[in-house]
Curated annotation (Swiss-Prot):
Its cofactor is FAD. This is Probable malate:quinone oxidoreductase. The keyword Flavoprotein applies. One of its GO terms (molecular function) is L-malate dehydrogenase (quinone) activity. SUPFAM superfamilies: FAD/NAD(P)-binding domain (SSF51905). Pfam families: Mqo. Keywords: FAD, Flavoprotein, Oxidoreductase, Tricarboxylic acid cycle. Belongs to the MQO family.
Amino acid sequence: MSNRQIKSDVILIGAGIMSATLGTILKELAPDWKITVFEKLEKAGEESSHELNNAGTGHAALCELNYTSEKKDGSIDIKKAINVNEQFQVSRQFWSYLVNNKLINNPQDFIMPLPHMSLVQGKENVEFLKKRHETMIQNPLFEGMEFSNDPETLKKWIPLIMENRPAGEDIAATKIDTGTDVNFGALTRMLIDHLKAKDVDVNYNHSVESLKQASDGSWEVRVHDLDGCKMEYHSAKFVFLGAGGGSLELLQKSGIPEGKHIGGFPISGLFLACNNPEVAEQHHAKVYGKAKVGAPPMSVPHLDTRYIDNKKSLLFGPFAGFSPKFLKTGSNMDLFASVKPHNITTLLAAGVKEMGLTKYLIQQLMLSKEQRMEELREFIPNAKSDDWDIIVAGQRVQVIKDTEAGGKGTLQFGTEVVSAADGSIAALLGASPGASTAVHVMLEVINKCFPQHIKEWEAKIKEMIPSYGLSLAENPELLKEINATTDEALRLK
């Protein structure tokens, strides 16, 4: 590479919620560091972070049934739900810090209070939900969660869903008022604007072409300036790959051994969006159902109130689609280009293992709009086709890797960090709960990649996140205090 390199302390690739969060935290911890951001598109937060490319759920395991499972003895395992909730609590604390320190002006531009509900039908599912509720309310994280199978109560909670339901139907719901709707696109843009004001060099229309580690451990990054039609050469001690579906390709280009034997499978999301404001006005909650038997976790149907640009809207989905692209704006060659000699057996093993997912995707692809409306009518019996339009959401690249528990070619359904042994580069891969846990995940990156600084940074981290290093589930008094301060800062009460 050219010797005429522009040097930075940190390079962030991708201007989505993950890079924006990491950049903001690092600027608070090390204000003198030079940080440079490269984004291929012309604006920040245009891919998975964009408000129309995700459901905007503040994932806190308040309503998502796939975070709780029934054990063989009939008891309910809520460990995963506790973990997800704790992670979202970290995000709430950090966002409150930003508001209290005037780094964000109006929290309601990106977060709104909204009840989170779980809804089930059928005797067995009602029994499961009741047991789940009884287990969860014993934990302080889920205090205030209500259960009801009384039709009159449910009509008050979810009038649109309860209208014209057959008498005597087995139906039940839980409701908790501490849920949120989060506009991650708006939040991303606010954080990036803040970084620019703090002299972070944010470059749009810049595509990273190659990464190579130099003999001193730093990274040399070749970047194509799409506006100026020229190549630029940059170097940094640390590089973060926060390019959504594009992170896998960049991880492979880095050549680090930790990036071997990892593949990706792209799944696109479709939603039905209500175009009738009168209908949207009748619903005020995020209501999550139960995935059908044999369906993957990402197929959980939900009916969501959304707040976008101060307007209330209503979405139902997701329905799965398939495109070989790893990004909405990506190439049809993305999937094929990601197949390498080191991951081909991993991908083939997943293909054999995941026949159920393949069958599910084929079935989803063949659905007509009217068949999708029939699924919506399981939630809203009176739904009219003319009131709903199909919209295409973002691409999600599910990670496929070899694991001890699952063996070769195991499909992962979460968010994970892959980092080099020397901590000089890290990549964020995967999907849900994603953006909701961005602060927790970026602190994980910082702990993995900057261990030599953690001691000097600890006091500042605790100022930003008072529960840092502690379990709120095990510290109910601290939880109460933090809930009160974050509710006030974020105007959630």
